[in-house]
């Protein structure tokens, strides 16, 4: 089958699973889709063992034709980030701007260093001492909370507005920051040319600040198009230009596409839409992007479950899989509680804020896509048969599955408690 045919069949399968999950009201839809897809993968694996590998091999071969990294990083990610940013209320975002800035920028750096440091120490304890730059690579790809997974769950659970905007704002911005850090560390780890601090810093500044500036330019261009357009029915199609052609442009310019999508989405949603569109057109725009977001979310979480078929679980990697989850949680705890130690000196917060930010820091397809982008054939040790990409893929997948199935299913109780406290504080 061609990649197009595979994508069409997967889209149909995601719709069927979405219909099933809509009847199972116990879990949020994206969690149900992931769980059902994982179950389907296990059935396929078992069938391959019992009835032979022919069917299993055919399915794996077909799935491998899909470039998951390109499909997510260069395709779905731009649309999903833009859709999420359109819903962000700028007046609420401004109230939490320093918290979001610190959590997204400083928190991601702290988490990267803590996770990388812990992995370096524990790998030595296990007798497979990893290069420190490889450990930092894992820290960089797993530290950003996945905006796709986070927004899909937080929106439906109804957390208090101040906590929700922190979770949503952090997840929208820190994935772009995480990608920039990941690219910088990748150059340090794999480049054959000597790198300088100035060179790496310049890359970071160009990607991050350039992405935000480019996003503002995209928003201004779309604003002008909407303003001068006489054919009002074209406004929906015009918004598609930003995450499609706009994202390609960011890649060509060498700036962060994710940050550009977030910046342009926030500006368009808070400036262009209220000023240039009628209320009925505004509602149509919301419905249009909700449809796109829902479709891509269903397809993405289906793919996350089916990726189990493509990952090779070597016996030597089990300890790293088991240690990955607590290492990442420790990094998340430190990167949240340390900034909040300073935040609480200046402002009062819900007592569940840190807990929700820690436990709501879900990981998803973004981390897996970054892991898949690593080169193959790089051994973790001289003379070792363990491939670095395979190791980081296995560890990342363990964290992603845990965060979606365990954290995603248990965070509603924390949000319920925070809502109860919020309501109690509002009563006279």
Question: What role is predicted for each listed range?
Answer:
Residues 1-428:
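Transmembrane helical cores of multi-pass secondary ion antiporters/exchangers
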């Amino acid at each position: 089958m061609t990649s197009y045919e595979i994508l069409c069949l997967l889209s149909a399968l995601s719709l069927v699973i979405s219909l099933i999950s809509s009847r199972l009201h116990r879990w949020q839809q994206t969690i149900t889709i992931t769980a059902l897809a994982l179950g389907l993968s296990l059935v396929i694996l078992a069938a391959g063992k019992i009835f032979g590998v022919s069917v299993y091999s055919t399915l794996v071969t077909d799935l491998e034709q899909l470039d998951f990294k390109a499909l997510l990083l260069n395709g779905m990610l731009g649309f999903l980030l833009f859709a999420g940013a359109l819903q962000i209320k700028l007046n609420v975002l401004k109230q939490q701007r320093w918290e979001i800035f610190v959590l997204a920028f400083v928190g991601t750096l702290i988490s990267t260093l803590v996770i990388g440091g812990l992995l370096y120490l524990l790998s030595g304890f296990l007798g497979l001492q990893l290069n420190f730059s490889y450990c930092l690579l894992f820290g960089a790809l797993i530290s950003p909370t996945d905006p796709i997974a986070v927004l899909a769950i937080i929106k439906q659970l109804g957390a208090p507005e101040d906590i929700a905007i922190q979770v949503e704002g952090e997840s929208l911005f820190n994935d772009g920051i995480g990608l920039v850090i990941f690219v910088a560390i990748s150059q340090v780890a794999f480049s054959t040319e000597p790198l300088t601090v100035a060179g790496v810093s310049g890359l970071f500044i160009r990607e991050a600040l350039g992405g935000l500036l480019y996003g503002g330019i995209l928003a201004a261009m779309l604003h002008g198009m909407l303003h001068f357009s006489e054919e009002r029915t074209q406004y929906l199609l015009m918004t598609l230009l930003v995450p499609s052609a706009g994202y390609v442009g960011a890649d060509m310019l060498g700036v962060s596409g994710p940050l550009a999508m977030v910046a342009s989405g926030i500006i368009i949603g808070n400036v262009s839409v209220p000023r240039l569109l009628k209320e009925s057109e505004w509602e149509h725009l919301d419905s249009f992007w909700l449809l796109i977001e829902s479709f891509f979310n269903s397809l993405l979480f289906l793919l996350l479950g089916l990726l189990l078929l493509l990952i090779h679980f070597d016996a030597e990697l089990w300890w790293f899989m088991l240690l990955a989850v607590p290492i990442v949680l420790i990094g998340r705890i430190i990167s949240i509680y340390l900034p909040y130690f300073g935040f609480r000196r200046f402002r009062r917060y819900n007592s569940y804020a840190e807990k929700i930010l820690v436990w709501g820091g879900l990981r998803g397809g973004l981390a897996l896509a970054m892991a898949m982008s690593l080169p193959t054939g790089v051994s973790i040790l001289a003379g070792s048969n363990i491939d670095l990409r395979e190791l980081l893929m296995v560890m990342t997948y363990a964290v992603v599955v845990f965060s979606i199935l365990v954290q995603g299913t248990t965070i509603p109780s924390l949000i319920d408690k925070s809502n109860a406290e919020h309501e109690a504080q509002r009563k006279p």
